[in-house]
């Protein structure tokens, strides 16, 4: 039996409900998560900020792709720690 080929193009839908001025409830694949702002910025701190969510997605993608590349090359990763240091210049985005 041959290797399973993944689809090159996939479609999916994500929905966001504005629960408040700072919190968005996100739904996809039967899962729900929140994107929120910290209390000091008027949020309820129930989830990552939008910027933190973006960096978390990059960290998650780095994990998945690294493991796929390792497996393809016959390497077993016993442990991997991904560290992201971020310096975010908020000038121009602060309303």
Feature roles, as predicted:
Residues 58-62:
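Alpha-helical metal-binding/catalytic segments enriched in His/Glu/Asp
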